[in-house]
Amino acid sequence: MTAKSVGNFSIWLVIAVLSVGVGGYALYLTATGFEHLGLRNPMLDPWGLRVHIAASGVAMLVGAFQFFKPLRQKAPTVHRWTGYIYVAACTVGGLAGGTIAFFTTAGPIAGWGFFLLAVFWVPFTLLALASALRKDFAAHERWMIRSFALTFGAVTLRIYLPIAIIQNHGDLPLDAYRAIAWLAWVPNLIVAELFIASLPRLKRRKAAPAPAGV
């Protein structure tokens, strides 16, 4: 295993651990209820929230493993069926998230941030499925990267929130939450697009023959 492959695996492992951790916590919340979270918005549909959190949790649990090359190569059937689970979870989670986005107590700026996340998340995921079904695996890879970048917004959201709370001595100002509603996913998508743009060069380099020894 080369240093580069070790580095790539390490990056994937960090992403997978964070995703599984957040996804597992989401399912724990779904199973135990949300009363201990102190939700104060009476207009928020608790079932819409439950569906969003549960489905998004499933997407987080299985999403990172769709990019695990040994799984794709050695267990393609497992890869395919966990992919179907991922697509279903993202679709349900995104639709449920879109329905509750504007009930946030942080106002319409945060609401639009969460709503547009759902607007992009669902079609990106369905386009990943459609490209796989027509065996256009290059397009499938691109759309899956975009989809998972948005799925990973659940992780980045939970990275930004405690940072904002610590910086504000235990409080979370509404302005900070409004910013986080966008920061949780827009930078992820930008990074995904930059990575997608680099894929042809990375694949050419990987396919190039090794230099002859001196």
Model-predicted segments: where are they?
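Alpha-helical membrane insertion/targeting regions
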Residues: 1-214
